[in-house]
């Protein structure tokens, strides 16, 4: 009985939190939150494996003074003792956002896994990140944003994963603690996720090569930021800002055309406006939809109006525009 009471209390706490987060100014805020949830995208998943082993090379001409150089095949990870390869760097070939999974195996027969193994995984977007010490950390933002994870594995063989979502291209693996037995990776994969699939845009044959490259990078960056909302960034500050909604929705309208994601963000921001009907500049999805309280900016509130107008222009969805019209008027 006690167990069921605790579950009921938890459900009520969640319900009260969500209700408290919603605006009391608009009578339809609860409906707006439901409409936002109905537009939540289904992810496109794709599994990736490391392509090559690389090493960091100092290069004054390279971005941030570092570049990567190919040094070997990833097969050694699965056939040789990982203890021989502590500090190895893997290149997955492209920037990815998602989850990392792996499994370990013992090398040899009749060998006991007699002690735990401790591994450190450092995920980096660019070579310079792997070559800049994380500690001591002088930054004002949370140190926990940096993507270094230490995992202790009590037995081998074992399957494991990094518990948080990651954004990276390069992965460095250090062996921090091990016993006398040899072990290697049995499997390793990264499951990338996005609300959209990769596309190729048809540009004019006369398009400058630099513009083509900028367009390619822009498309990829947008894809990585299109998760369950238009994120400010898939690695850090994973939340929805009004200005990011405006900019990313504009780019999406001419590329991926996932207008439901734009609609979701418009409704989510409206549902979580403050009790005076004014929009918060930024909102969060987890653990439940809620705003960054006190984060009000007139410029951002007005940008919301422009974002809704652009959405109407590209979709012709008058129903949504009329539904959110009271929010537009209130910001002015």
Question: What are these language model-derived features?
Answer:
Residues 235:
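Short, solvent-exposed loop/turn elements at beta->coil junctions and helix N-caps
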Residues 1-23:
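Bacterial Sec-dependent N-terminal signal peptides
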């Amino acid at each position: 009985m006690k167990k069921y009471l605790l579950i009921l209390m938890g459900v009520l706490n969640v319900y009260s939190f969500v209700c408290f987060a919603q605006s009391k100014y608009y009578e339809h805020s609860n409906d707006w939150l439901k409409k936002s949830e109905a537009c939540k995208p289904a992810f496109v998943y794709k599994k990736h494996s490391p392509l090559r082993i690389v090493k960091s090379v100092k290069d004054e001409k390279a971005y941030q003074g570092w570049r990567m150089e190919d040094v070997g095949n990833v097969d050694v990870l699965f056939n040789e003792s990982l203890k021989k390869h502590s500090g190895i760097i893997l290149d997955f070939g492209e920037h990815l956002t998602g989850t990392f999974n792996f499994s370990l195996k013992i090398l040899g027969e009749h060998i006991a896994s007699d002690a735990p193994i401790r591994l450190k995984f450092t995920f980096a977007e660019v070579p310079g990140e792997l070559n800049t010490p994380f500690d001591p950390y002088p930054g004002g933002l949370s140190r926990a944003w940096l993507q270094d994870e230490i995992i202790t594995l009590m037995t081998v063989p074992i399957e494991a994963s990094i518990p948080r979502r990651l954004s990276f291209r390069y992965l460095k693996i250090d062996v921090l603690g091990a016993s006398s037995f040899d072990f290697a990776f049995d499997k390793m994969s990264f499951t990338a996720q996005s609300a959209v699939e990769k596309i190729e845009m048809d540009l004019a044959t006369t398009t400058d090569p630099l513009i083509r490259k900028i367009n390619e990078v822009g498309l990829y960056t947008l894809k990585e930021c299109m998760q369950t909302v238009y994120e400010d960034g898939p690695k850090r500050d994973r939340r929805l800002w009004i200005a990011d909604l405006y900019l990313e929705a504009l780019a999406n309208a001419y590329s991926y055309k996932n207008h439901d994601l734009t609609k979701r963000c418009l409704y989510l921001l409206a549902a979580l406006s403050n009790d005076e009907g004014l929009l918060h500049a930024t909102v969060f999805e987890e653990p439940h939809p809620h705003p960054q309280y006190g984060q009000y900016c007139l410029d951002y509130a007005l940008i919301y109006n422009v974002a809704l107008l652009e959405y109407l222009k590209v979709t012709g969805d008058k129903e949504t525009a009329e539904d959110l019209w009271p929010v537009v008027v209130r910001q002015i």
